[in-house]
């Protein structure tokens, strides 16, 4: 139970003030319905979070998102943070574990536990937000081999530089799995306020960003340095749109 409740995905992520610490990390996990319906699980998670993960008395706050798209569409993502590794030294009480079993595990199977650590160098976060109510999460599984890792990192880094130079008002937070299983995965987290932002071809980055990028790096550079690099050095990109359940 301890492993199931303390494991975690998600970059993740309205605005919360970042507590002073050396790194930003979230524990995340997916919840797949197994018994009962959405209403029961949502109510159960809210009850558990309000009691044990409310951000008071030194506890990290927990959040729940509904996954609208991607490989886990129809499931939920539960995240707690920002948190520290040292927080894992504190053993959960019997009452805490029992409450999780009665209010969450009774209705859902947890899986996909990840410790998501934010990469500040690759992150562009103008408003210093930590958690987003609605987020687009892009996962990039990198092919095995240092040359593949370096190529994808450079592509992601150059986008961050372009966002800074253009002073974009759209954030893009970048996370890594602290304990990768197999190949490395870079997760890009884009907060959004309205689904209308996805009309047209915009998928996270600002509208017209490709033109802005090429004004900095040269004509054709976006396809060569981003699209072609991801095609050659990753195993594709998944898109998960998550909306917070309050």
Where are these regions (language model features)?
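Bacterial Sec-dependent N-terminal signal peptides
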Residues: 1-23
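Short S/T/G/P-rich N-terminal loop/turn motif that feeds into the first structured element of a domain
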Residues: 20-246
């Amino acid at each position: 139970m301890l492993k199931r409740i303390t494991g975690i995905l998600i970059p993740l992520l309205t605005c919360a003030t970042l507590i002073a610490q050396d790194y930003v990390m979230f524990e995340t996990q997916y919840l797949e319905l197994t018994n009962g319906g959405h209403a029961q699980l949502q109510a159960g998670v809210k009850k558990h979070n309000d009691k044990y993960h409310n951000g008071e008395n030194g506890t990290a706050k927990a959040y729940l998102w509904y996954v609208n798209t991607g490989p886990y569409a129809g499931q939920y993502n539960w995240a707690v943070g920002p948190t520290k590794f040292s927080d894992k030294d504190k053993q959960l009480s019997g009452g805490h574990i029992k409450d999780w079993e009665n209010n969450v595990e009774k209705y859902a199977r947890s899986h996909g536990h990840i410790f998501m650590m934010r990469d500040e160098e690759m992150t562009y976060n103008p408003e210093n937000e930590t958690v987003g109510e609605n987020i687009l999460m892009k996962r990039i599984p990198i092919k095995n081999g240092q040359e593949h890792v370096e190529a994808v990192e450079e592509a992601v880094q150059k986008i961050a530089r372009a966002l800074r130079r253009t002073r974009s008002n759209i954030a893009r937070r970048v996370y890594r799995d602290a304990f990768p299983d197999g190949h490395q995965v870079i997760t890009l987290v884009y907060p959004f306020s309205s689904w209308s932002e996805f009309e047209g071809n915009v998928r996270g980055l600002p509208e017209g960003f490709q033109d802005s990028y090429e004004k900095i790096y040269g004509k054709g550079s976006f396809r060569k340095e981003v699209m072609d690099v991801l095609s050659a050095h990753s195993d594709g990109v998944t898109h998960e749109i998550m909306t917070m359940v309050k």
